[in-house]
């Protein structure tokens, strides 16, 4: 009986000892990756890109001894290879985030993307901000200036995102600083958009039209809509009196100047269908479509809610419908 009791006590003591070891546990072996640490390179005012931080490695003790509750594990953060390019994001102002690429060898940074919050900037405000701040950003963040060709990439449009983007393949010395005076934007006209920086040019006129999606080319360029408008006006001038011809020239001039406020090119080729917006008067925006055969049609008429109530807009259209069709179609 005494021997049996001693055996039972030994077995129960062994079970308690193993239970304590299971409850205490042991850290994973050295070198095992247990988690990804996302803020290893965090700097004030900067939003870290997830792809820029490697996984963290657990460096706890071995599994032979029990770990105490007061022990603190050590973490070793792997650094990127020397000379390897790394992306990082800086929030320069509320609603403005810029993605940079650190160049190899510590040679500065390259500007990759500028992101604007759609809740704080429309496309005209974003263009104006970049025109006023591009030199400051280049100096502040040590952005290298390249003389290589800058090629635009296709614009991104995602209805699920509430942000707008400037995308730039490379940084240039000739970043545009001149911005046209845009027409006022109403909430229903704000859509997803992209603006791309062209290569530096020598003439001031080309610099004023660096943002092609935001302003059309000057009348002297090879824009098919401008050529079609001039060709349509020539036979009309030939069959009208001098006074009527003068009115037609004024109308063409008004169209050319007003269309610089905004241009919208459809998904089809420019040689097939072209659309542009004309500001007939403050608060009235007329969208005209030109087909491949040169015929024009009135696409839509939009009124600013700040200047026109619904009844006033209907009255304005009834009074000016014939004039609009004769002037722009």
Swiss-Prot record:
Residue ranges, compositional bias (Polar residues): 253-263
Region of interest: Disordered: 12-37, 151-263
Subcellular location: Nucleus
InterPro entries: Brevis_radix_dom, BRX-like
Sorted UniProt keywords: Nucleus, Repeat
Family: Belongs to the BRX family.
The protein's name: Protein Brevis radix-like 4
Organism: Oryza sativa subsp. japonica (Rice)
